[in-house]
Amino acid sequence: MSTSHASPRETTEGTVYTVTGGDWDEVVQSAARADDERIVVNMGPQHPSTHGVLRLILEIDGETVTEARCGIGYLHTGIEKNLEYRTWTQGTTFVTRMDYLTPFFNEAAYCLGVEKLLGIDDQIPDRATIIRVLLMELNRLSSHLVAIATGGMELGATTIMIYGFRDRELILDIYELITGLRMNHAYIRPGGLAQDLPPGAVDQIREFVKKMNKNLPEYDKLATGNPIFKARMQDVGYLDLAGCMALGATGPVLRSTGLPHDLRKTQPYCGYETYDFDVPTADTCDSYGRFLIRLEEMRQSLRIVEQCLDRLQPGPVMVADKKIAWPAQLALGPDGLGNSLDHIKKIMGTSMEALIHHFKLVTEGFRVPPAQVYTAVESPKGELGVHVVSDGGTRPFRVHFRDPSFTNLQAMAAMCEGGQVADVIVAVASIDPVMGGVDR
């Protein structure tokens, strides 16, 4: 017999049962025996601790969660569909808005896929690749700072929240200097970067690294030296290696089980195999282990950022192929709009053909050979994969993202059922889902 499930509902005509499977008489008896304490609670979608518009449907018996489900889709933006109506280069401005806390990873994954389809992945200038790694590691820092800050705030640790956002602000200032924006950068483009690092950027990053190395021990003291913080996180949101494998969980959730799986080591991209860093793991399988992993990953990211700064050499930041490359070495003109004479000369040259080519490249875009490819990068939340399909045109036929927040959120039920209602928030915070990435 299939397992039965009944939910009784009182109406003006008596009790109405909604039933799936099972024998009718047994269903009515089991529903009649249902405990008075059993209650269904909606946590979200506007609950302050649901990390955006996440809805959690909890069935609770007293203080214990007996069943937990996620309701997603409140932040659906149709980004994957929109990409099918834009050129390959314009796609960057869309993907950067998915997981809005890790924009550089979205852009990098997408651009690596497009470059692989074009067959130019070995022609990307070294300087562009190093700057990509630099920005991704700064982004890993800023994402983990938000995870730790919001996670602390939900436990009532407001100091750690203030510290987290204070340090993240320094990173956002660096983004603003380099890309002009604090988020939604569209800075990584197919073939390279939108433009080179501005004067003063390297010095500002070095200053930040120095400050951050000094500030990181504060998080250690605030959190690991705080018995209340530890008591609220230890043995909460438990998910072992078998559970992670079954659910496809990646990132800190997977590494908290002791498996050192990091795509930067297992499937290196952007030259990560040449950088010296460690993959932190824990063996606790709980929220506290994930917190410690994020803390240690921030230290490793600072190491990689320092190595990037030491490697930077002058050079181009866009491929030489004029059929693909948008103008990237731009200078700001006297009108403040980038319309400098050098810039105009570079586009127009002295021939009408050069201007026609530039016009076609920007309006129509370049063609990508018909093929499909899957590329993945290690985002702060786990494996961010992108499946890009081209039909030979100037626009993608299909772009699908494997967002780590979406996959990891499936583990919510396994982490929460059987635990306390108060621990649900801690478990969700340890996954660190961003709904922009989940719903896309």
UniProtKB/Swiss-Prot annotation:
One of its GO terms (molecular function) is NADH:ubiquinone reductase (non-electrogenic) activity. Its EC number is 7.1.1.-. PANTHER family: NADH DEHYDROGENASE [UBIQUINONE] IRON-SULFUR PROTEIN 2, MITOCHONDRIAL (PTHR11993:SF10), NADH-UBIQUINONE OXIDOREDUCTASE 49 KDA SUBUNIT (PTHR11993). It is found in: Cell membrane. GO terms for cellular component: plasma membrane. Belongs to the complex I 49 kDa subunit family. NDH-1 is composed of 14 different subunits. Subunits NuoB, C, D, E, F, and G constitute the peripheral sector of the complex. This is NADH-quinone oxidoreductase subunit D 2. It catalyses: a quinone + NADH + 5 H(+)(in) = a quinol + NAD(+) + 4 H(+)(out). Keywords: Cell membrane, Membrane, NAD, Quinone, Translocase, Transport. The gene is nuoD2. NDH-1 shuttles electrons from NADH, via FMN and iron-sulfur (Fe-S) centers, to quinones in the respiratory chain. The immediate electron acceptor for the enzyme in this species is believed to be a menaquinone. Couples the redox reaction to proton translocation (for every two electrons transferred, four hydrogen ions are translocated across the cytoplasmic membrane), and thus conserves the redox energy in a proton gradient. PROSITE patterns: COMPLEX1_49K. It comes from the Bacteria. It comes from Streptomyces coelicolor (strain ATCC BAA-471 / A3(2) / M145). It is a peripheral membrane protein.
